[in-house]
Amino acid sequence: MELDFDKMNGLVPAIIQDNETRKVLMLGFMNKEAYDKTVETGKVTFFSRTKNRLWTKGEESGNFLHVVSIKADCDNDTLLIQADPAGPVCHTGTDTCWGEKNEEPVMFLKALQDFIDKRHEEMPQGSYTTSLFESGINKIAQKVGEEAVETVIEATNGTNERLIYEGADLIYHMIVLLTSKGYRIEDLARELQERHSSTWKKH
């Protein structure tokens, strides 16, 4: 990666994004030395313009930013770093430097899909998910049907708390069903996205 450090007197902006939630956590600046150290250690290191030295995020608090990926923009003068934060990012104690909560619950579905994929690949004994895969597609489909019925019952005659509980079970078993057929939850998301594009006229 050939970065252009000349435009800002030896610095490039580095946008830090949570690898899971995709929330923007903070913005810092790197010189070449800070960038090289970040790549070498796997922990985000900036150049402090006030202290005039390198500083690794978390060197005092322990709230390191563990690098997952580093990308340059089209002009090679700005970085997007996806990282796993070890704790609150801002020195004020908030999750982000904009005072936002670092959470995006819907993104957990991808993490859940990855977990179920791993179960399908490794098939560890004693795992409930393994037992589902071992039972075969018909049993998995039956389980999805049962969870769907339970969700409907809670929606019509149950409590809101139980509706959420049973709905979560339904989604979990649906992901298992998709995985057993070679698909992922993202495939459903793509289908919904296509349906709601500007060219989709049925809704």
From Swiss-Prot:
Which GO biological process categories is it annotated with?
Answer: L-histidine biosynthetic process
Q: Name one Pfam family in it.
A: PRA-PH
Residue numbers spanned by region Phosphoribosyl-ATP pyrophosphohydrolase: 109-203
Q: Which Gene3D superfamilies match?
A: MazG-like, Phosphoribosyl-AMP cyclohydrolase
**Compartments, as annotated in UniProt:** Cytoplasm
The UniProt gene name for this protein comes to hisI
PANTHER family attached to this UniProt entry? HISTIDINE BIOSYNTHESIS BIFUNCTIONAL PROTEIN, HISTIDINE BIOSYNTHESIS BIFUNCTIONAL PROTEIN HISIE
**Organism of provenance:** Bacteroides thetaiotaomicron (strain ATCC 29148 / DSM 2079 / JCM 5827 / CCUG 10774 / NCTC 10582 / VPI-5482 / E50)
What's its top-level EC category? hydrolase
A GO term for molecular function? ATP binding
Q: Which UniProt keywords apply?
A: Amino-acid biosynthesis, ATP-binding, Cytoplasm, Histidine biosynthesis, Hydrolase, Multifunctional enzyme, Nucleotide-binding
The UniProt family comment states: In the N-terminal section; belongs to the PRA-CH family. In the C-terminal section; belongs to the PRA-PH family.
Pathway it acts in? Amino-acid biosynthesis; L-histidine biosynthesis; L-histidine from 5-phospho-alpha-D-ribose 1-diphosphate: step 2/9; Amino-acid biosynthesis; L-histidine biosynthesis; L-histidine from 5-phospho-alpha-D-ribose 1-diphosphate: step 3/9
On whether Nucleotide-binding is a keyword of this UniProt record, the answer is yes
**One GO cellular component from the entry?**
cytoplasm
Q: Where is this region: Phosphoribosyl-AMP cyclohydrolase?
A: 1-108
Catalyses which reaction? Answer: 1-(5-phospho-beta-D-ribosyl)-ATP + H2O = 1-(5-phospho-beta-D-ribosyl)-5'-AMP + diphosphate + H(+); 1-(5-phospho-beta-D-ribosyl)-5'-AMP + H2O = 1-(5-phospho-beta-D-ribosyl)-5-[(5-phospho-beta-D-ribosylamino)methylideneamino]imidazole-4-carboxamide
Q: What Enzyme Commission number(s) appear in the record? A: 3.5.4.19, 3.6.1.31
Protein name according to UniProt? Histidine biosynthesis bifunctional protein HisIE
